[in-house]
């Protein structure tokens, strides 16, 4: 490359600006500088020669074919423990000790809390086992359908059978009760029937008191047992015929009650002749209603 005049001048100026020491070094052979280095390290090179005898490999290093084995290790000399290091180790030991103490306290609290609950559970289990042991006083047998094995259930079954029999008897006595289904409806019909009988008896007693007030004293003296004995074994002969004649002579309503309108119309003519027969019939009819009433009521309350 051909340099211009200006480029040459710039290059010369740069070379002139270089330090004079560098120029001196370049101008000299360099012997003086080497002498300075030797004076710094020593004239006889004693220190450098000491490094020549330094072993290439340590005592613990193994050489294999001039190479250092990978398994070799450099052992450091043990360093003496100082007081500061001991304090640090003690602090590190105390920290886990405190943590273990806290854990032990928590475990103790948990055990204290679980002990009463475990005791309660054990008591409940003991009571359950004792109750199970005390319950079966009988030999438990698998019952078939419609049968029972317990004494209480057997007694309850017998009681229900008695109630059903008494209810059937009441159904047979009370008219129109066979059509009703259900015990509640049957009891309602029976109560209504007993109330109607009571009203009829009261009505008959009032009529008898109007016809002949002297009969009240005789009726009070008589008892229900005597009337029942009379109806179970009545006297034969004329008494039965007189009763049937008296029964035909008295007209009846549709409900079975006596029609006293005819008797009151002919009271002046026929009352004197049939006073004894009418009074006997009225007493017998009253006794009949009373006996029916007592039987129905006794059967009703025997169910309870």
Curated annotation (Swiss-Prot):
The GO terms describing molecular function are: DNA binding; DNA-binding transcription factor activity; protein dimerization activity
Q: What are the Basic and acidic residues biased-composition ranges?
A: 94-103
Q: What induces it?
A: Induced by flagellin, jasmonic acid (JA), brassinosteroid and cytokinin, and repressed by abscisic acid. Insensitive to gibberellic acid.
Q: Which GO terms describe its biological process?
A: DNA-templated transcription; negative regulation of innate immune response; regulation of DNA-templated transcription
SMART domains, per the entry: HLH
One Gene Ontology CC term in the entry:
nucleus
Tell me the SUPFAM superfamilies matching this sequence. Answer: HLH, helix-loop-helix DNA-binding domain (SSF47459)
Instruction: Check the record and name the Gene3D superfamilies matching this protein.
Output: Helix-loop-helix DNA-binding domain (4.10.280.10)
Report the protein name in the record. Transcription factor BEE 2
Protein's organism: Arabidopsis thaliana
Q: Which gene encodes it?
A: BEE2
């Amino acid at each position: 490359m051909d340099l211009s005049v200006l480029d040459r001048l710039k290059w010369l100026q740069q070379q002139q600006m270089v330090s004079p020491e560098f120029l001196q070094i370049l101008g000299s052979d360099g012997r003086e500088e080497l002498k300075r280095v030797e004076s710094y390290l020593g004239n006889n090179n004693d220190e450098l020669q000491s490094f020549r005898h330094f072993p290439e490999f340590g005592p613990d290093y193994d050489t294999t074919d001039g190479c250092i084995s990978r398994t070799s290790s450099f052992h450091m000399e043990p360093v003496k423990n100082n007081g500061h290091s001991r304090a640090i180790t003690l602090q590190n030991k105390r920290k886990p000790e405190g943590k273990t103490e806290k854990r032990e306290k928590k475990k103790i609290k948990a055990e204290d809390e679980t002990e009463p609950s475990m005791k309660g559970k054990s008591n409940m289990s003991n009571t359950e086992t004792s109750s199970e042991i005390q319950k079966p006083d009988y030999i438990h047998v698998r019952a078939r359908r419609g049968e029972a094995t317990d004494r209480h259930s057997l007694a309850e079954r017998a009681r229900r059978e008695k109630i059903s029999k008494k209810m059937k008897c009441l159904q047979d006595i009370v008219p129109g009760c066979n059509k009703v289904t259900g015990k509640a409806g049957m009891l309602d019909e029976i109560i209504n029937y007993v109330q109607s009988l009571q009203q009829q008896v009261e009505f008959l007693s009032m009529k008898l008191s109007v016809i002949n007030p002297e009969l009240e004293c005789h009726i009070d003296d008589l008892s229900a047992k005597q009337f029942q004995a009379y109806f179970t074994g009545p006297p034969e002969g004329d008494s039965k015929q007189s009763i049937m004649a008296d029964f035909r002579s008295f007209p009846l309503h549709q409900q079975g009650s006596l029609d006293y309108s005819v008797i009151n119309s002919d009271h002046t003519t026929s009352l004197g002749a049939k006073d004894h027969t009418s009074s006997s019939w009225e007493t017998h009819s009253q006794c009949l209603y009373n006996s029916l009433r007592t039987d129905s009521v006794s059967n009703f309350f025997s169910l309870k």
